[in-house]
From Swiss-Prot:
Gene name of this polypeptide: cdaS
Stated consequence of mutating E46K: Suppresses a triple DAC mutant, 20-fold increased production of c-di-AMP in E.coli
Record-given protein name: Cyclic di-AMP synthase CdaS
Catalytic activities: 2 ATP = 3',3'-c-di-AMP + 2 diphosphate
InterPro entries according to UniProt: C-di-AMP_synthase, CdaS, CdaS_N, DAC_CdaS-like, DisA, DNA_integrity_DisA_N_sf, DNA_integrity_scan_DisA_N
Expression induction: Expressed under control of the sigma-G factor in the forespore.
Length: 207
């Protein structure tokens, strides 16, 4: 799986990049229409190229909105982003709760206290398979890793039967509080985040 490229980006820069992608998509789609009936046209190739542009645009949007949702509440956006990127590459499952305005501890079964500075290497080690702390949620508050191996409430809503426990827990916690919950699937390595009881994919752009 391609790794997601995170970078801090301003709203104006984000919109500028999206505009460039949209203009490219419109231009490419227009060209496909003009040559649609030509015998030597490789339609599958051109649609594949167009899909790559969409993927890159979705990746930029994923990074920007994730940043905008959490940077007010923790200065460690880049460290968190680096950690889930690495965990995704290795298909190490992870569940990270980023506390925002609502206190979350009354909704969780507390695990092991950490009160450590946020670093990508520490987060990666926590979720390394076999680590006693990996099977649970990591709680982030401001610039601290507060605790690990926390048990979260599962969503009570009907969800896709293919969603695992981590994703159900992310939906549950983000439904009870305004916390943002990051998830990495250990089966696929796919990244996502839950906000307001809804799960959003973190799309990987090409590198």
């Amino acid at each position: 799986m391609k790794a997601m490229r995170y970078e801090q980006i301003s709203e104006n820069a984000f919109k500028g990049k999206i505009q460039v992608y949209l203009e490219q998509i419109l231009g490419d789609a227009s060209l496909i229409l003009k040559t649609l009936h030509e015998k030597d046209q490789c339609l599958l190739c051109e649609l594949d190229d167009l899909g790559h542009v969409f993927q890159d645009m979705q990746g930029i949007a994923s990074s920007f909105y994730l940043q905008s949702y959490i940077e007010e509440f923790t200065p460690a956006f880049i460290e968190l982003a680096k950690a889930i990127k690495a965990l995704s590459e290795h298909k190490h499952g992870a569940l990270i709760v980023i506390e925002r305005a609502d206190p979350v501890e009354r909704f969780i079964q507390k695990g092991t206290s950490l009160h450590a500075e946020i670093s990508s290497s520490l987060i990666e080690s926590i979720f390394f398979p076999g680590n006693p702390l990996h099977d649970g949620a990591l709680l982030v508050r401001e610039n601290k890793l507060v605790s690990a191996a926390n048990v979260l409430p599962l969503t009570t809503k009907e969800v896709d039967i293919h969603l695992g426990t981590r994703h159900r827990a992310a939906l549950g916690m983000s439904g009870y509080t305004d916390a943002l919950v990051l998830v990495v699937s250990e089966e696929t390595g796919k990244m996502s985040f839950a906000k307001d009881g809804v799960l959003y994919p973190l799309i990987s752009p090409r590198t």
